[in-house]
Amino acid sequence: MLAGVHDLFTEQDRLAINTTMAAGSQTQFDALLVEQPRPSVGKRLIPLIGLVLLAIVIGLILVAMIGGLGLIGLVILVVASVFLARMIARWWHIRSLRNASRLKVIGGYAESRGWQTVDQIALPATTPLLRSGDRRKTGWGVQGTLGEQVHFCAGEYIFETRETSSDGNGNTTESWQQHPFTVAVIGATLEGIGSMRIQKGKTDGIWSKLTGMVTSLQPVPLESQEFNSSFQLLVSDDADQIAVRERFTPVIQVAFVDRGLGTSQFEAENGVLVAARKGSPQTDNFGALMDVLADAVWMRTVFTNKPAGRLPDIAALRALLLGPNA
């Protein structure tokens, strides 16, 4: 996100929350390492079996090729694979403990806010992004309410596309391509607008016009040429144009230009608003997940504020997002 007076969650906020969580997760990690000093049996056996089998296969090939010297190579490979398996098991164990410690600290923060952490966030297929691909899945995240009535969830969302390829003999191979996102989903009814999409681009550009031809969304050029050149704003074909312009007043257009979208994109449909960025959320960068949630909160306010067209109250929204002591 670009720094500006309309930022709800700043770079300083992200660094502060990440620093606090890093300190807490290190304490948790030290405690977990005392409780679980050695990798589990599974973590030790999986790399050991895999590497030893690979070493044996390579060693047998060497024996077949160079005889007795290959046998010596086989022994060396097996011994090396045992040591390598131990290193991998240790790395796997440490990585798992660090991830667990980070999630524990995130869980503590979420609990202090009245939220909860989940292994899989619940996402209904309410917007085009959440319906994309041939199959979809979710990962870890947080969910709860902001204030009394604003329900949200934020975390990992992945849609997968099936890809097939054929060789010269007509044999077909199928593979799956993953498209991971960090998303924040929040309730929002866009009165008079219905559904919308806004992302980096040009509202009056060729891609916006093509999108309007093949989807139920149409581009809406506004008064600010700088806005139109920076953002692609699409709304329902049957949207009330007056309602759109009541929301996107000149002062709101200036706020968009000042604030920027960073790498976020937004969709709203069926009473839900989605803020999304490419890439999965990381447990060692919880601030980035909070940043996406902040984007969703700010955008929701633009579309639901009453009276329409006023600038979001940043101080009030920061208290909503970060708590009364923000």
Model region roles, listed by residue range:
Residues 61-80:
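Hydrophobic alpha-helical transmembrane segments
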Residues 53-60:
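Hydrophobic, membrane-inserted alpha-helices
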Residues 42-52:
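Select subsegments of transmembrane alpha-helices in polytopic membrane proteins
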Residues 15-23, 33-44, 105-165, 171-326:
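Charged, low-complexity intrinsically disordered regions
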Residues 1-31:
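Short, charged cytosolic
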Residues 58, 70, 313-317:
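Terminal low-complexity, poorly structured segments
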Residues 73, 91, 95, 281-284, ...:
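Residue-level detector of alpha-helix boundaries and kinks
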Residues 81-109:
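Transmembrane-cytosolic junction motif
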